[in-house]
Amino acid sequence: MLTLSRFNIESGLRRSLPIEDGFMKFVDLDRCYSVSRVSVSNDKELVLYTLHLSAYTSDGTIATEQLTMLINDMQAEYEKGNYCIAGGDFNKDLLVDSGKIFGIDGADYTWAQPVDPTLFDGTNLSMVAPFNEEKPIPSCRNADGPYNDKQFVLTVDGFIVSDNVTVSGSDVYDLGFKYSDHNPVYMTFKLNG
C-alpha cells in the first residue's frame, strides 16, 4: 500500500486488522490500513486511510470486523473535528449487484458480498462507490485466469468519507486491466469549513 501526496504528510501509522484464526489464516494476507495525517489551514487534519480488506474469509465475519474497526477509527477522528477519507480495496461489491450492472453473472463468485449499510448507522460517514451510470467501468476482475471480456467483473475499490468532505465526482479509469486485476479509481472532493 502506498499513499502519495503533494501536501506534506505529517505522520503515518500502520493499523493491523483482525484476520481469521483457522486455515484461512494461511491463505489470506495479514491485513492492515495506513493512517496518514495532513495539516489543513483551520488547525484541523485531513486524515487519509489507505486500505486492503480481506476477500476470501470463511463466513464474512472477519471482513465485517475489519470494516467496523475502520469505521470506528474514522468516526473518532471526525468527532475531533478532522476530515476523513478512506480509499482502497474493500473486497466488497460496492455497487451491490455488479453482475447485473456489468451483465456478467457472479453467482459462482461469492467472495465479494455487498457492504452492510447498517455499519454506517449512527456515524457521520458514507460510502462512495466510483460509478458512471452512462458508461459503467468495473474496478476489478476475477483473477482466475488471463483477462477476457466474459470474465466476472465488479467494483470493489472505492472510498469512505466523513460528512465534512463534499465529493464532486468519483469514477474508474478504464485501463482494460492492462497492469493488474484492478483498474484505478479516483475521487474529487473539497473540505468543508
Model-predicted regions and their roles:
Residues 1, 29-35, 153-159, 181-186:
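Short hydrophobic/aromatic beta-strand or adjacent loop that forms the aromatic wall/cage
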Residues 47, 57-164:
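Metal-dependent phosphoesterases centered on the DNase I-like endonuclease/exonuclease/phosphatase
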Residues 165-176:
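Low-complexity, intrinsically disordered Gly/Pro/Thr-rich segments
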